[in-house]
């Protein structure tokens, strides 16, 4: 998934001029005096596993009922699609409205800021953080090698110029194979192997030969598996939002293509937003020098800003079936808090780990 670098304009108030405003373009990154980072917004990925089935009629399909007593055999090619499964996942994308510049005091421990490739803050003083950058592409399934029925035809079958005669001979060969298989099963064949493994191998081979010759009458159906992913970045609750459409004849379609039935998604946030992991009561105590007592709260604004996401119930469904239903924390449904810079004024480095999908605090430890 290609991601574009985003630039955010941050409004900086001049310290010496109350009426003057400076606008600076920031690009995420780490410098000697601090770091610029994004917090993420949460995107919901909906992945559909689709099976495409293609039917090709057999060369002798019109004789299936006459010689094999198999009816309802189609004489026409057909392709149709079906939804095999639907999966949900979340991913963090840089939120241009949440770009921050953090600058630590000169007496603080030099922090190690870890950013993702697109500038999302992943952690502070944590050197090993794993995060997902792209959805893993589905590995295409290898198509089975199809045996040509003509490779199993007798000389008489290959020499005949009549389809009716070919159908008669092919049906006779199928019946011969079935008879041989039954004889082996009943152990009445003089040439039947005595060991069980040998019998199994011969029975499997006879079954394969029958299946290949049957394709002349019943046709062949091939299948292909593909994955289609839609990504939604919710800003508010949603009900019966159409993320795509599905057609048995055409497969997954664009939401505006009325040739398919709608696929809906419901996103409903909870009314309760989680409390901050770190509150003012749990922040480390300081003994500031005389005359600096009022500066502690101001230093909090210079700390690490993180998200407090709100959970949302996500449901993907059609008019006839519910395909997926999960609950996820969504960054943009919650609010933000600040981890005080006082944490990083200690001699010992404080380790902070954030969720790459939501920007929430996962761990704070020494």
Regions found by a protein language model. Name each.
Residues 4-13:
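Sec-dependent N-terminal signal peptides
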Residues 15-19:
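Sec/Tat signal peptide C-region and signal peptidase I cleavage site
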Residues 20-366:
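N-terminal amphipathic/basic membrane-interacting segments and domains
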